[in-house]
Amino acid sequence: MPDQSDKNVILKDFFKSTVLLSELDEILRLKPETLIGIDKVSSDQLITNGIKTIGDLANLSASDLPEIRDILPSMLQKWVKIAQLIHKNVKEQLKRHKKVLMIGLDNGGKTSLLAVVQDKFSIIKSLLPTRGVKREKLDFFGYPIISWDLGGQIMYREKLYFNRPELFFTEADIVLYVIDSQDPDRFTEAANYFREVLKVLIELKENPEFLIVISKSDQDIRKTLQWQQNVTNIKNKFSKVIKEFEQFSIDFCDTTVFQWETVMQMFSIALKKVSDTSEIIENILEEFTDQVDAKAASLVSMDGLIFGNYTDSETDEMLVNNTALLLQTLSNFYNSIGLVREKSIKLDLPLNGFTVRGEKLFEYSDLQIPVYLWALVVEPKKLEHKLDYFKQQLLPLINLFL
């Protein structure tokens, strides 16, 4: 069976040599004349009859074709079948990619969040607001993701997105709605835009997962009364909107690009919402914490994806996750200067009577990304006899996470 790169080559063979196929989701929006065998005159005739794209051509029934002047029925039938073959191939490939939709007002911080998860810290200060739509095929934590970053300027919202919503809001697995926590003058505008997005999704019969991302929650700002009031204001305004649309599952999360771990945790929450195995992973972690008398446990990839965690305490969850992410960052630094990565990483806090310890279980994806099982424990030795048992249970679930 051909792999994805082979299929991309196969798709390219249907198109004229001058056509560049950069993004899968753009293929079905190309004009008919981009296909080999369809000249400009025939393409114009198709467009005149409402068949403007390869997607439109694929939607025709080969057994009930329209009559189009100067185009033989047999020729049209062939083109339709080719378009349908391309359509099927594109849709199959897209199903293997989770679609993440980044929405929010301009200057909200959407593109900066994507830059952090791609380790592009140096470009954040020079980023300009996204104009229109920026689509990227990304390797998120070793999994294929299609990211749609929708610029938030009003002219794009009114004249582009809501004019042709089916082009932008369909087949999204999760929507990240980003709002600037430091811009209270636009909270009402942001909530109204959010409402319009939900209305469009209902009209399109789409039901993606949602995460409202309260961005620019910088560490120094978080300590102020103003920030706390802003967050309360945001949640109040958005909660009123959410009550109007009870069919959606919507959560809140705050981040800052100046603390990498907050961005990783935000994306982890988002991906867990659309994962096929995250719930099972967390059930296994619950069993693990019980057997080793741990206060909390998390399964974390070396590049920052938290596959799942279990604890009875929100404080313990923050403690184990933040410690894991920071110690793994230190491990990555050691590895970058030529040191061998340790299989066991720990931080002892004797005055507090516990240890945070991470044990490497396995690697996943073609990128061979290490995965560590982290636990907040009083007696770390209890972990040693249980690791192989839980490793065998967790490995297949990680491979099927997305």
Task: Walk through the language-model features, giving the residues of each.
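Short hydrophobic alpha-helical segments used for membrane anchoring or interfacial signaling
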Residues: 297-309
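Switch I (effector-binding) loop of TRAFAC-class P-loop GTPase G-domains
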Residues: 94, 117-144
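Compact, charge-rich alpha-helical regulatory domains located at protein termini
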Residues: 1-91
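Switch II of P-loop NTPase G domains
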Residues: 145-176, 180-200
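Conserved beta-strand/loop subsegment of P-loop NTPase cores
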Residues: 172-178, 201-218, 239-254
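Canonical P-loop GTPase G-domain recognition
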Residues: 220-283
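A charged amphipathic helix-loop-strand protein-protein interaction module that recurs
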Residues: 312-361
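Glycine-rich phosphate-binding P-loop
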Residues: 99-119
